[in-house]
Regions:
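Residues that define the transmembrane beta-barrel architecture of outer-membrane proteins
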Residues: 13, 39-43, 90-94, 114, ...
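Outer-membrane beta-barrel translocator domains and adjoining extracellular loop/strand segments
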Residues: 29-34, 72-78, 109-112, 129-137, ...
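Predominantly the C-terminal beta-signal and adjacent terminal strand-loop region
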Residues: 161-227
Length: 227
């Protein structure tokens, strides 16, 4: 008879609290068509809590506020330049994100000093539902709307001493709405509002780029593996 005994490897679990600061760019029906060009003119700030439950995997919870804008006159497309519409919007976002390190990050071993990482998750966003009044090119605020979104991206992080980490990341937020720029508003008064325009089959994207600084703490436990 062969008795199989599970082998459990237990290590200290570290947690982090931190702040992300950077900029955004928007991809949709109004403004530039550049895919990745975050700008500090549309800033983004996010508080986060992270639980590193292994040397490669972490769960990140976020609460952030970001601004976006689109200006047709800055676009390289002639039709958008001629149309000359513009908007600005404020985005509140709450996210749960799974982060995967390329290299092992063992906080008890200073030789584990840096790693690239990938991440994906689920977000819930609050934004302003906009519309364009008749004969006007600047979007007006109508009401607040909510939607889900999928954050995904890449980054790199490095340790600063024993307790601090500095990171840089690029995040793409795919939203389940096409209303961030006012191109498909929720109509209240169709007499005073311009009709919808653009591609209704393509939802809006927001690109984030910036730096994070976090503080690590805690000595909980996690199970690394079973045999």
């Amino acid at each position: 008879m062969c008795l199989i005994i599970p082998m459990v490897f237990v290590h200290a679990q570290y947690r982090e609290v931190g702040l992300f600061l950077g900029g955004t760019n928007y991809i949709g029906e109004v403004g530039k068509t550049t895919f990745v060009q975050p700008s500090l003119k549309t800033p983004s700030a996010t508080l986060f809590y992270k639980s590193n439950f292994s040397t490669r995997f972490a769960l990140r919870l976020e609460l952030g506020l970001s601004s976006i804008r689109g200006i047709d006159s800055l676009s390289a497309e002639p039709l958008r330049k001629e149309r000359a519409m513009s908007f600005s919007n404020s985005i509140n976002h709450t996210s749960a994100i799974l982060e995967v390190n390329y290299f092992e990050m063992d906080f008890s071993d200073f030789e584990s000093s840096w790693s690239p990482y990938l991440f994906v998750g689920l977000s819930y966003i609050k934004y302003r539902d906009l519309y364009y009044p008749i004969s006007e090119s600047v979007a007006n605020y109508q009401t607040n709307e909510f939607s889900f979104a999928i954050p995904m991206g890449v980054g790199v992080k490095t340790r600063l001493g024993m307790n601090f980490l500095l990171g840089f990341e690029i995040k793409a937020l795919y939203t389940f709405t096409d209303k961030l720029d006012g191109s498909f508003p929720t109509f209240v008064d169709e007499i005073d509002q311009q009709p919808a325009f653009g591609n209704s089959l393509s939802n809006d994207w927001i690109i984030f780029g910036g730096f994070s600084l976090s503080y690590s703490f805690g000595r909980g436990w996690f199970i690394e593996g079973l045999l």
